[in-house]
Amino acid sequence: MFWDRAALVYDYFERAYNGKVYRATGKAVAEEIAPDDHVLECACGTGAISVCVAPLCAKLIATDFSNGMLKQTAKKVKRFTNVEVVRADITKLDFADSTFDKVIAGNVIHLLDNPQAVVKELVRVCKPNGKVVVPTYINKKNSKSAKMAALLGKAGAGFKRQFDMESYQRFFSEVGYRNVAYRLVEGIMPCAIAVISVDNQSIQTI
């Protein structure tokens, strides 16, 4: 698997190429977390967001499909007693409905064949009045970041689509979510963060 191979060098690449955004995204996501929260993180990667969230919540379950990525996350969070690192498939989560106060899925929906179904799965496991937080790198057409994404795709990253801010917002609207807040972390490869407030309307889209 590409991501198992990439796990050992992923942090080095991110810090060298897009370090400002890489660091700021974790901090921005952490602002959505409350002390009593039970949090599910999908596609945790090497744990860049996990280490920002863990000290702020009651419980964090960090998941990924790549064993290589999970090993890197486990190293980063080993000092925390409230974190569990688990292999999981984001397309079919083995958790009951309305389990978590917050659900996070960072930089993954552009890799998926059916991201619409996955967003609904994230909402399914989130409690009413909870939040689903979805950070995703975005690119302007013909920008340096778009060209870099294309190169990574050729290397095996498996990008299925690229978003700009407008198409990112449109994606959530077309899935059926209206109560969504957005913020943008600026940098070489910017990161758009969508925060879905899980209300009755959100649940009805599942």
Model-derived features: positions:
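Conserved class I S-adenosyl-L-methionine
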Residues: 1-34, 48, 72, 76, ...
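Class I SAM-dependent methyltransferase SAM/SAH-binding core
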Residues: 40-92
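A short acidic, Gly/Pro-enriched loop at the edge of an enzyme's catalytic core
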Residues: 91-103
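A short SAM/SAH-binding and catalytic strip from SAM-dependent methyltransferases
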Residues: 102-114
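A short glycine-rich, Lys/Arg-flanked "PGG" loop and its adjoining helix->strand segment in the class I
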Residues: 116-128
